[in-house]
């Protein structure tokens, strides 16, 4: 019996855009610590049930997924990766201000605030 194994890479765990990497690089330079990496994570809370968070860290945990773009490293823990698989991390500047934006294909609903989401049609957005 012959089996065929597809060795082509599957879709990336996360997409880290050039705009996001450039802004993170700028923020790291302001901190004066080139060892910093950006961690993106998901936690319970927010008006849609789950929310995104960002933090600078030096250490990489053994089970972290790392994504590198233009010399900047993005870290994601395994639990958060379950919710962020295939998401795009971007940085946008516009009339509403400047912010990091996560385009998450796993979110079934999200709040207008942009930092809260649900994966199972959870709570609707309440006023902030």
UniProtKB/Swiss-Prot annotation:
Residue sites binding iron-sulfur cluster per the record: 47, 111, 113
Cofactor: iron-sulfur cluster
Single Gene Ontology BP annotation: iron-sulfur cluster assembly
The record's free-text note on cofactor binding: Binds 1 iron-sulfur cluster per subunit.
Isomerase in keyword set: no
Keywords of this entry: Iron, Iron-sulfur, Metal-binding
Single GO term (MF): iron ion binding
Disulfide-bonded cysteines: none
Record's function text: Required for insertion of 4Fe-4S clusters for at least IspG.
Family statement: Belongs to the HesB/IscA family.
Subunit structure and binding partners: Homodimer.
Protein known as: Iron-sulfur cluster insertion protein ErpA 1
The encoding gene: erpA1
């Amino acid at each position: 019996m012959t089996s065929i194994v597809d060795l082509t890479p599957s879709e990336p765990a996360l997409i880290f855009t050039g705009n996001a990497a450039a802004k993170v690089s700028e923020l790291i330079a302001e901190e004066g610590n080139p060892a910093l990496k950006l961690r993106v994570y998901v936690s319970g809370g927010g008006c849609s049930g789950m929310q995104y968070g960002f933090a600078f860290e030096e250490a990489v945990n053994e089970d972290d997924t790392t994504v590198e773009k233009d010399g900047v490293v993005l870290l994601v823990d395994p639990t958060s990766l379950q919710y962020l698989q295939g998401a795009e991390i971007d940085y946008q500047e516009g009339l509403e201000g400047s912010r990091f934006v996560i385009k998450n294909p796993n979110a079934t609903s999200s709040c207008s605030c942009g930092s809260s989401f649900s994966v199972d049609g959870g709570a609707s957005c309440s006023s902030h």
